[in-house]
Amino acid sequence: IGIDGSFLKHKANGKEVVINMPMPTHKEAIKLVLDTLVSKENGVIKSMDEIDAVGHRILHSGESFTSSIVLTDETIAVCDSNSDLGPLHQKANLTGIAACRELMPNTPMVGVFDTTFHLTMPDYAYRYALPTEYYEKYKVRRYGFHGSSHRYVSAVAREYLGQGKGEK
């Protein structure tokens, strides 16, 4: 998005389609994805009404959310307040969410955070040996990332091993 050489790769019905097109904004890129999903030639759904909800991967929840959330004006504002914790990714995530909300105003949106999986760590594991002020004022702590992948892999591993949640 916003660079030369943008493309959308889409595979449907065993056929791969590559659309080379400038995508100067998140909104234009998401519109291209949505148009492709419903296109007569390469689509996989007949209409946008078939999309019941949209899930968004969001980098950082800080300590604000401990699980996935429904995205509302209020929860998005909280996500934005955590942007300083992930300055390279968080704003881009929120820009994509805003574009989806504009293009799909009646479709529920859900935020799934990279960091929530790791929020169960005890304080001795996530706190650094620094003055408490740094933790409280600047949110300096270990957060952990790629939590949605870790959650999935650990669930599949538990299933494979025949163990329930929380078993060791």
Give, region by region, the residue ranges found by the protein language model.
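N-terminal glycine/serine-rich phosphate-binding loop of ATP-dependent small-molecule kinases
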Residues: 1-62
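Glycine-rich loops and low-complexity Gly/Arg-rich segments
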Residues: 21, 78-82, 134-138
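Short, low-complexity, polar/charged sequence segments that are solvent-exposed and flexible
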Residues: 15-18, 73-76, 128-132
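Charged/polar, solvent-exposed surface patches and flexible loops
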Residues: 31-35, 77-81, 102, 155, ...
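Conserved active-site and cofactor/substrate-binding residues in soluble primary-metabolism enzymes
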Residues: 24-28, 32, 54, 70, ...
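Short beta-strand-loop/turn "lid" adjacent to the catalytic site in phosphate-handling enzymes
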Residues: 37, 43-89, 110, 116-127
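ATP-dependent adenylate-handling ligase core
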Residues: 18-21, 85-88, 141
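ATP-dependent carbohydrate kinase catalytic cores
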Residues: 94-168
